[in-house]
């Protein structure tokens, strides 16, 4: 038996049936429709025809004797296939033999339970929602892609913060139950005592001599000390005329100039002092920077091993604008200050004028005293003659045994009083 030959038809694309509204295709989320004859459909359109995002929003309602259905082409219930692909409906005109093809849109119909209890529950939920929650619901239904992405990110962060807070609270309760409040307060005070000591070199409080409290080897290794021979030659052979020129040109700080004036005549001692003074002068100049933009921040005269030491021990590596850079943070400046004080103590037989150093480092007197006390120096006053025959009080710092007890800064003491 020969197969039946179907008549051919020509396609004719007609666009939307009424010029603006596409044909409606429906699918039911809870099954297949058995008897479509008793369905009553109503299509609702957004009245805002000027807004390009809202003018195509549609809601389709369907009613039967038993149940009502609703579907829409926007919001969370909309089908994504409407934006990813196009749907068409073909109607065969038997008279002309043409297949008229119209644009169509697919709606996912979901059952609507309009029970009184559900409506009252929704009304109550709407009343209890905050303004932020209502705005989030609007963004979820009508917001742009960017707004929805920001909403999802905020919700994820909120969940993460809540989980973190619960974990921290649980951990805190466990620690308090284990150690007790008294032990925790004692630990906090002990940590405060060590805050200002984090940037200090190792302190040997059981030393028998002042020079062993802060050992010179912790400041400069033998290789670093050897590398200072060449750059410190100018200081080692400095003359009175050159010192006067330094004063006139203001090329070096006051402490360095005063130290150069009192260099010992003994060759070995003079060499050691010159190297220490040069390194101290380098630290003070290095501290004046905020960001070190190149590897040789202080010029080609600084030995490579010293440059490496400065970048490694006195800067923080940070990432900014796609580039790594060496930053001299406030804590690193405090560390440099501590090293300068220790070098000055080794240069001046463990008694130094803190006021002169404070001015050279451009520090406040309060901050200088905080660091000096954290280093367990004994602070005293002395009248010093200045220009025009006048005198002023200077603070002296002395490293002597036995060491005084470690003192915290005023900021930490105030914080403990407040708590």
From Swiss-Prot:
Its main location: nucleus. The modification Phosphoserine is found at residues 35, 163. It comes from the Eukaryota. Keywords: Acetylation, DNA-directed RNA polymerase, Nucleus, Phosphoprotein, Transcription. Residues 397-419 are annotated as: Disordered. GO terms for cellular component: fibrillar center; nucleolus; nucleoplasm; RNA polymerase I complex. The keyword Translocase does not apply. Acetylated at Lys-373 by CREBBP/CBP, leading to decreased RNA polymerase I transcription. In normal conditions, deacetylated by SIRT7, promoting the association of RNA polymerase I with the rDNA promoter region and coding region. In response to stress, SIRT7 is released from nucleoli leading to hyperacetylation of POLR1E/PAF53 and decreased association of RNA polymerase I with the rDNA promoter region. InterPro entries: RNA_pol-assoc_fac_A49-like. Pfam families: RNA_pol_I_A49. The modification N6-acetyllysine is found at residue 373. It is found in: Nucleus, Nucleolus. The keyword Phosphoprotein applies. Coiled coil: none annotated. GO terms for biological process: nucleolar large rRNA transcription by RNA polymerase I; RNA polymerase I preinitiation complex assembly; transcription elongation by RNA polymerase I; transcription initiation at RNA polymerase I promoter. GO terms for molecular function: DNA binding; RNA polymerase I general transcription initiation factor binding. Component of RNA polymerase I (Pol I), a DNA-dependent RNA polymerase which synthesizes ribosomal RNA precursors using the four ribonucleoside triphosphates as substrates. Appears to be involved in the formation of the initiation complex at the promoter by mediating the interaction between Pol I and UBTF/UBF. Component of the RNA polymerase I (Pol I) complex consisting of 13 subunits: a ten-subunit catalytic core composed of POLR1A/RPA1, POLR1B/RPA2, POLR1C/RPAC1, POLR1D/RPAC2, POLR1H/RPA12, POLR2E/RPABC1, POLR2F/RPABC2, POLR2H/RPABC3, POLR2K/RPABC4 and POLR2L/RPABC5; a mobile stalk subunit POLR1F/RPA43 protruding from the core and additional subunits homologous to general transcription factors POLR1E/RPA49 and POLR1G/RPA34. Forms a heterodimer with POLR1G/RPA34. Interacts with POLR1G. Also binds UBTF/UBF. Interacts with PWP1. Belongs to the eukaryotic RPA49/POLR1E RNA polymerase subunit family. This is DNA-directed RNA polymerase I subunit RPA49. It comes from Homo sapiens. The gene is POLR1E.
């Amino acid at each position: 038996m020969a197969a039946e030959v179907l008549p051919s038809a020509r396609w004719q694309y007609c666009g939307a049936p009424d010029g603006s509204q596409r044909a409606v295709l429906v699918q039911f989320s809870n099954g297949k429709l058995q008897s479509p004859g008793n369905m009553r459909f109503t299509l609702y359109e957004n009245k805002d025809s000027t807004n390009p995002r809202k003018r195509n929003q549609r809601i389709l309602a369907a009613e039967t004797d038993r149940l009502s259905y609703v579907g829409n082409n926007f919001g969370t219930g909309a089908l994504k296939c409407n934006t990813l692909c196009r749907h068409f409906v073909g109607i065969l005109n038997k008279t002309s033999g043409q297949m008229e093809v119209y644009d169509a849109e697919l709606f996912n119909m979901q059952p609507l339970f309009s029970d009184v209890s559900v409506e009252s529950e929704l009304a109550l939920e709407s009343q209890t929602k905050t303004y932020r929650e209502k705005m989030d619901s609007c963004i979820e239904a009508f917001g742009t892609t960017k707004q929805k992405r920001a909403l999802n990110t905020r919700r994820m962060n909120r969940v993460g913060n809540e989980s973190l807070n619960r974990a921290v609270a649980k951990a805190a309760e466990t620690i308090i139950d284990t150690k007790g409040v008294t032990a925790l307060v004692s630990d906090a005070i002990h940590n405060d005592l060590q805050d200002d000591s984090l940037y200090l070199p190792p302190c040997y409080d059981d030393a028998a001599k002042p020079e062993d409290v802060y050992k010179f080897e912790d400041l400069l290794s033998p290789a670093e000390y050897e590398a200072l021979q060449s750059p410190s030659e100018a200081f080692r052979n400095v003359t009175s005329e050159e010192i006067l020129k330094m004063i006139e040109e203001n090329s070096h700080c006051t402490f360095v100039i005063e130290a150069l004036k009192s260099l010992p005549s003994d060759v070995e001692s003079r060499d050691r002092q010159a190297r220490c003074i040069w390194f101290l002068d380098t630290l003070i100049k290095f501290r004046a920077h905020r960001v070190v933009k190149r590897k040789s921040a202080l010029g080609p005269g600084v030995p490579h091993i010293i440059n490496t030491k400065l970048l490694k021990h006195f800067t923080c590596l940070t990432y900014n604008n796609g580039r790594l850079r060496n930053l001299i943070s406030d804590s690193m400046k405090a560390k440099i200050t501590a090293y300068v004080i220790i070098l000055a103590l080794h240069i001046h037989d463990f008694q130094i004028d803190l006021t002169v150093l404070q001015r050279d480092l451009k520090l406040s007197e309060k901050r200088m005293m905080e660091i000096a006390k954290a280093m367990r120096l004994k602070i005293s006053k002395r009248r010093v003659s200045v220009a025009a025959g006048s005198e002023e009080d200077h603070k002296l710092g002395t490293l002597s045994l036995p060491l005084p007890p470690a003192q915290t800064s005023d900021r930490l003491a105030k914080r403990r009083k407040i708590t």
